[in-house]
Amino acid sequence: MRKHYVILIALYTLSVSAVERVSLEQLQADWSRYTNQMVQVSTPLVVCGSFYDSLLLAPERLYCPEERAVGLADGDSTEYWRIVESNRANSIVIHCRNSYYKVRTGDRVRGFQARVTGERHFVTGAGVKTSHTRVAKLERKEKGAVRVVGANVENLFADLGGYATRRTTPKQNALKLSKVAKGLKAMKGDLYALCEVQVGDKAPMMLLEALNKGGKKYAYVSMPVENMDRIGGCFIYRVDRVRPYEAPLSAYADTSSHYYARMFAQGFACVDKKGAPTGERFVVSLNHLKSKRPGRGNYDTHLKRLSNVDSLLAMLPKAVALYGDSDVLLLGDYNCYTQELPIQAIVRAGYPDQLMRFCPNDYSYIFKGEMGYLDRCFASPSMEAQVVHVQPWHVNADWYYQHGAYRLKDKSLHRYADHEPIVVDIKLR
């Protein structure tokens, strides 16, 4: 019996010693040497993406190349390709047994054991231990400031079925509404500029009913359109803080245009608790530009976004004249990263990027493990002097979910949409 114990101990020692401890740098130097071997990866890594049974890991978070460099659609650059190659070379994919809904991008991984199955790929029959220390902190609003929130709420529809990303069951639709309402309430906004809301009255009224349960009194403004089975935008405002004046102004004269209800401006007047005007006014332009297609380049959709920006820039002087105020905020989902030409065109037209002013290294969206800003906040020169704080609030993009469906047990506000909201505090004077 003792002899058997000795043999078992020897075999166990051999199996343990067969698992080589290596750094990511050692693996990168010669992947072929470690292929089909069990290894213990010692390099601290961060979760950049979560895809069903796979995690994308890297030494640090990965930026979308167009967030930091001129991309393919704008003429290409050496820096763009350097980032593309760096993101690929410094990231690995591990197939594991983690519960996808428990892993967030930004989680830390401090070593794991797995089999190398090829360059940058690992497989393990166990889970990968992750830790999360970040807090989605939202700065408190400065006394006397007006809080304006720009948010893509990802296809908020009152009706079921039909639209490609609409929730298909009453329970899913109710959970979606509950999450959006919780998220908006938590931000304590005085004015919300919302993208991807079903046009017409149904969806805004549905959201107002949920918001007004808390004792606040909200109302809404949207562009009147005939086709009610599509997405647009709307403003939701606290009636004891701001009130709209004059009619909304679209960047598109054609009411049948897909962008008529997606790109428009509205003037707002500040009021006291009794609803009396305080004399301060400002203008908010809500914009949702043409979406990207998967893959690099996107030249055809890029041209459409440039056209969207041309229409926007032509509309803004009209908005200033209509509302009689040059204090203008531009919010919404621009579907462009920071270094892309549509964004730079807006900046060059005299509307500085407030995210680059307050938090240039942050993000509002994650796609295939790469992060960047698709959601924006620009300000006219007179408004920029009155912007006191801007931040993305990280309650959505880091959380995984299956497209079009939530876990019904998840009653939190997290992942109410796929984009982070942009929170803006202004002190008008």
Model-based region annotation:
Residues 20-36, 96-99, 104-108, 116, ...:
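Metal-dependent phosphoester-hydrolase catalytic domains
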Residues 202-289:
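Structured beta-strand-rich core segments of catalytic domains in phosphoester-bond hydrolases
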Residues 55-62, 173, 192, 264-273, ...:
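Extracytoplasmic, non-cytosolic globular domains
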Residues 145-160, 246-248, 281-291:
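Active-site-proximal beta-strand elements of phosphoester/diester hydrolases
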Residues 9-18:
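Hydrophobic h-region of N-terminal signal peptides that target proteins for export
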Residues 2-8:
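Sec-dependent signal peptide recognition
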Residues 18-145, 150-162, 176-178:
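Extended non-catalytic accessory segments flanking core domains
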Residues 33, 58-59, 65-66, 120-232, ...:
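N-terminal, active-site-proximal structural segment of metallo-dependent hydrolase catalytic domains
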